[in-house]
Amino acid sequence: MLTVGCTLLVALLAAPAVALVLGSCRALEVANGTVTSLPGATVTLICPGKEAAGNVTIHWVYSGSQNREWTTTGNTLVLRDVQLSDTGDYLCSLNDHLVGTVPLLVDVPPEEPKLSCFRKNPLVNAICEWRPSSTPSPTTKAVLFAKKINTTNGKSDFQVPCQYSQQLKSFSCQVEILEGDKVYHIVSLCVANSVGSKSSHNEAFHSLKMVQPDPPANLVVSAIPGRPRWLKVSWQHPETWDPSYYLLQFQLRYRPVWSKEFTVLLLPVAQYQCVIHDALRGVKHVVQVRGKEELDLGQWSEWSPEVTGTPWIAEPRTTPAGILWNPTQVSVEDSANHEDQYESSTEATSVLAPVQESSSMSLPTFLVAGGSLAFGLLLCVFIILRLKQKWKSEAEKESKTTSPPPPPYSLGPLKPTFLLVPLLTPHSSGSDNTVNHSCLGVRDAQSPYDNSNRDYLFPR
């Protein structure tokens, strides 16, 4: 059905211009005897009545806000360079007797209107409006010519009067559309006054596709304590949207104030708050929100007015060592949860910044630092001496192990020395292939001396 409607609309728009004329846009009619003029022109007013004919003296009086009078010979009054303020009735009299009245209307032709149509939500009528660049004259009128197109009832033409709002400085017209209607409209705005008329180009719209909400309202951006890269954003649905029947989806965009590129987030349906997790620390951000019907019906609203906000900034504090520490610059939560996602961020990552010179360091601080240094030096000296003593002991033990065996007879008591290679005693009998091993470390039970090697020293 929608395809048929689109085909019909395209056919109408492709037709000759005559077929798209929705109505006749003409200048407004004026009362008989009214003289019309453009600003800056010269106007001649003629006093009516036979009494004013000939070379008689006629007295003219302007009935407007200004008290002006003229006296002429004959029944004509010439006004040069007339302006809008000259509009009004001019009374002519002869010998203090009123002869007649001549109305003068000075007006500016209307400018060509530029029509725009919208529908705030699926439950209301469509509104077509035009905002002129200058205030129109009081006599300017506007009317909307419309053609309704659907597949069931064909075409129907109608007109809608438009009202001018001094507060909004615009002409507006309402086109009745019932809820659920799926029809096309072709509209054109005619603006006319007593000196001319202009009509807009034809505009076509679909009753559902033209739905466009107002921007979200009451946008608030606030910092979250303890979160140096978070911003909380909240808003409300526009007053012209009833969320009881139709819900809205939202888009949120934000950027640092010095950047021109926005980051855009598409939010779930009916979500009216959001937390930005990747804001730059200590930087003011610009935030905007817009809405659209939950099922993508119609168009996105305009972006809401810009609102700025800065993430939480901790108060710097001075440590006992005289160093200024700003908790905002380093956060356990920030590094654990979010820093891995934004390693390419260009913000500064400095953590500590000295704020006091060494000359201003307090005495307790100096004593603590000096004591720590002295303790460290003493510990190093102790470790070096300990290692040196250990190395010396190991060297002595190694030299004793590699020295030649002591003589068999010594003055003092001997301690047995176990050698890795046993001493060989000369063989007395047996074949050459037999080797007799002496038993190392075996002593005589009655002698305190080791005489197991006597065969080697005293051969038989």
From Swiss-Prot:
Q: Which residues are glycosylated?
A: N32, N55, N150, N218
GO terms assigned for molecular function: ciliary neurotrophic factor binding; ciliary neurotrophic factor receptor activity; enzyme binding; interleukin-6 binding; interleukin-6 receptor activity; interleukin-6 receptor binding; protein homodimerization activity
Species whose genome carries this gene: Mus musculus (Mouse)
Q: Which domain of life is it from?
A: Eukaryota
List UniProt keywords, sorted A-Z: Cell membrane, Disulfide bond, Glycoprotein, Immunoglobulin domain, Membrane, Receptor, Repeat, Secreted, Signal, Transmembrane, Transmembrane helix
Matching entries from SMART domains are given as: IG, IGc2
Q: Tell me which tissues or organs this protein is expressed in.
A: Expressed by dendritic cells.
Q: What does this protein do?
A: Part of the receptor for interleukin 6. Binds to IL6 with low affinity, but does not transduce a signal. Signal activation necessitate an association with IL6ST. Activation leads to the regulation of the immune response, acute-phase reactions and hematopoiesis. The interaction with membrane-bound IL6R and IL6ST stimulates 'classic signaling', the restricted expression of the IL6R limits classic IL6 signaling to only a few tissues such as the liver and some cells of the immune system. Whereas the binding of IL6 and soluble IL6R to IL6ST stimulates 'trans-signaling'.
State the family it belongs to: Belongs to the type I cytokine receptor family. Type 3 subfamily.
Ig-like C2-type domain ranges (all copies) = 20-116
Q: Which GO terms describe its cellular component?
A: apical plasma membrane; cell surface; ciliary neurotrophic factor receptor complex; extracellular region; interleukin-6 receptor complex; plasma membrane
Q: Which GO terms describe its biological process?
A: cell surface receptor signaling pathway via STAT; endocrine pancreas development; interleukin-6-mediated signaling pathway; positive regulation of chemokine production; positive regulation of glomerular mesangial cell proliferation; positive regulation of interleukin-6 production; positive regulation of smooth muscle cell proliferation; T-helper 17 cell lineage commitment
Activity control mechanisms: Classic and trans-signaling are both inhibited by tocilizumab, a humanized monoclonal antibody that blocks interleukin IL6R signaling.
Chain ranges on the Cytoplasmic side, renumbered to this chain: 386-460
Q: What Pfam families does this protein map onto?
A: ig, IL6Ra-bind
What is this protein identified as? Interleukin-6 receptor subunit alpha
Detail the disulphide connectivity of this chain as listed in its UniProt entry: C25-C190, C47-C92, C117-C128, C162-C173
Q: Which residues form the signal peptide?
A: 1-19
Query: What PANTHER family does the entry give?
Result: CYTOKINE RECEPTOR, FIBRONECTIN TYPE-III DOMAIN-CONTAINING PROTEIN
UniProt note: domains:
The two fibronectin type-III-like domains contained in the C-terminal part form together a cytokine-binding domain.
Q: What is the lineage of its organism?
A: Eukaryota, Metazoa, Chordata, Craniata, Vertebrata
- Per the annotation, the residue ranges of the short sequence motif WSXWS motif are 300-304
The answer to keyword Secreted applying to this record is: yes
**Residue ranges crossing the lipid bilayer per the database entry:** 365-385
Encoding gene per record: Il6ra
Quaternary structure, per UniProt, is: Component of a hexamer of two molecules each of IL6, IL6R and IL6ST; first binds to IL6 to associate with the signaling subunit IL6ST. Interacts (via N-terminal ectodomain) with SORL1; this interaction may affect IL6-binding to IL6R, hence decrease IL6 'classic-signaling'.
User: Fibronectin type-III domain: which residues?
Assistant: 109-214, 215-313
Q: How is it modified after translation?
A: A short soluble form is also released from the membrane by proteolysis. The sIL6R is formed by limited proteolysis of membrane-bound receptors, a process referred to as ectodomain shedding. mIL6R is cleaved by the proteases ADAM10 and ADAM17. Glycosylated. Glycosylation is dispensable for transport, signaling, and cell-surface turnover. Glycosylation at Asn-55 is a protease-regulatory exosite. Glycosylation is required for ADAM17-mediated proteolysis.
